Each structure stands twice: as C-alpha cells, then as structure tokens.
Amino acid sequence: LFIPLFGWYLKKIGSISIEREKTTKKNLNFFITIDKVISKTDRPLIIFPQATRVLPNDRSPFKKGAARIYKELNINCLPVAINSGHVWPKIGEKKTNRIITISILKPIKPGLNKEKFLKTLEESIYSELDFIR
C-alpha cells in the first residue's frame, strides 16, 4: 500500500495488505482473511504481482504468490497495469511531474494452472505497459 496516491486510496477503502515477510507456506491464515473480506464486502482482490514499483522497462517475473492466491481462492483476476514507475521511482529517487495511466484489462477466469495463469497475467500487463508508456 506504499504507492503514492493509489496506495492511499487502497488504504482508505479498507484494503488489506499482505506482509510478504510474515507469509510462509506453513502460515495460510492470510487466505482465510482474504476470503472473508472478499465474501463479506463483495470487494475485488487486488494483487501487485511484482510486489514493488518497477522501472518502465523492467520485465522481472511476477511473484508466485499471486498465482497461489488465484488458485487457492478460485476467483476471477482483473489485471491492472499502472505505469507509475516512470513518475514515482523507488524511495530516494527523484520524482517527475508526469501523468500516470491506470489500465483495467480483460479478466482472467478461474481454472488455469499456476504457470499458465502467471504467463497470461505477465503477457497481459506487460503488453499494456508497452502500449501506455
């Protein structure tokens, strides 16, 4: 939730944050928490699969946790591409005065295996980021 403006909005609407350092294969309580929040509030699940802001040309593989959540909860995934890396780089770097584009992409239906899901998600988001750059 540490993305300027967008992160503040996510916090304001009551989004939950998954602390990567505390999440292990043995500690699956966060699945229960996520499932309860989604079912009670009818809110979407938003995952930042890179787990950090990246520079515009960075094509690092997405984290496997996104696929794990998708598979465990058996839910639709609505990919969102945000090109904020060129405006708000990581902490300590100079910010620029430019426009950020947020693109909501075609949903990915449940049922894909983890590898196919990650490949589909990466292709969807990265092709959109190339377009909105």
Locate the predicted segments by residue.
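Catalytic core of membrane glycerolipid acyltransferases/transacylases, capturing the structured
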Residues: L1-T23
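Non-catalytic C-terminal accessory region of glycerolipid acyltransferases
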Residues: L28-R133
